[in-house]
C-alpha cells in the first residue's frame, strides 16, 4: 500500500471517539508510580483524540493484603469484570525482606494475580524476547513461528 493511499484512507475514515472504563491496579513497589504515569499518558491521548478514560482503582497484591488481609477481594474481581480493561502495575515485593512472603502461599501477593487471571479467563503473560543468531539452535522456539 502506498503512502498516499494510506493517507487518503486515514482522511476518509470516520473519527470514532472511545469511552473506556478501566479498573486500575497500581500494585506494589514501583507499580503505583508507573501506573500513575500510564494514566497521564492515556489522559493525554484522550485529550488529543477525543477519547474518554474513566478509572476505578482496586487493590491487589501486598497493598490489598495490608488493607483487607487477602491479595485480591471478590469485590475487586467484580469491579475488574465490570470494566472494559484492567491497567495493572507490579505485584509483590522483595521476597527476602517483605513480610508478605512469611504468609502461606495462598495469601501472598502473587495469589492475586493467579485469581484475577482465572476469573477474567486470561492465560498468558506475554513478554518480549530477543533471540540472537548465535543461540538460535539452542532455543526451543521455532523459527517459523
What are these regions (language model features)?
Residues 39-49:
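Short catalytic helix/loop segments, enriched in acidic residues and glycine
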Residues 36-39, 92:
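Short, function-defining helix-loop hinge/capping sites that tune catalysis or transport
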Residues 18-29, 47, 52-54, 62-145:
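Anion-binding alpha/beta catalytic cores of soluble intermediary-metabolism enzymes, centered on
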Residues 1-2, 49:
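Generic detection of intrinsically disordered/low-complexity segments and helix-coil linkers/edges
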Residues 3-17:
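Short, Lys/Arg-enriched N-terminal segments with co-localized hydrophobic residues
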Residues 30-35:
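Short N-terminal binding/cap micro-motifs at the start of the first secondary-structure element
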Amino acid at each position: 500500500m502506498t503512502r498516499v493511499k494510506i493517507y487518503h484512507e486515514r482522511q476518509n475514515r470516520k473519527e470514532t471517539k472511545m469511552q473506556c472504563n478501566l479498573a486500575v491496579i497500581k500494585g506494589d513497589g514501583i507499580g503505583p508510580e508507573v501506573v500513575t504515569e500510564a494514566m497521564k499518558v492515556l489522559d493525554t491521548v484522550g485529550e488529543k483524540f477525543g477519547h474518554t478514560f474513566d478509572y476505578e482503582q482496586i487493590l491487589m497484591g501486598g497493598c490489598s493484603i495490608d488493607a483487607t488481609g487477602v491479595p485480591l477481594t471478590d469485590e475487586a474481581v467484580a469491579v475488574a469484570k465490570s470494566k472494559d480493561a484492567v491497567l495493572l502495575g507490579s505485584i509483590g515485593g522483595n521476597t527476602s525482606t517483605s513480610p508478605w512472603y512469611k504468609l502461606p502461599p495462598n495469601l501472598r501477593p502473587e495469589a492475586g494475580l493467579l485469581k484475577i487471571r482465572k476469573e477474567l479467563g486470561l492465560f498468558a503473560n506475554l513478554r518480549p524476547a530477543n533471540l540472537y543468531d548465535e543461540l538460535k539452535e539452542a532455543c526451543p522456539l521455532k523459527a517459523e513461528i
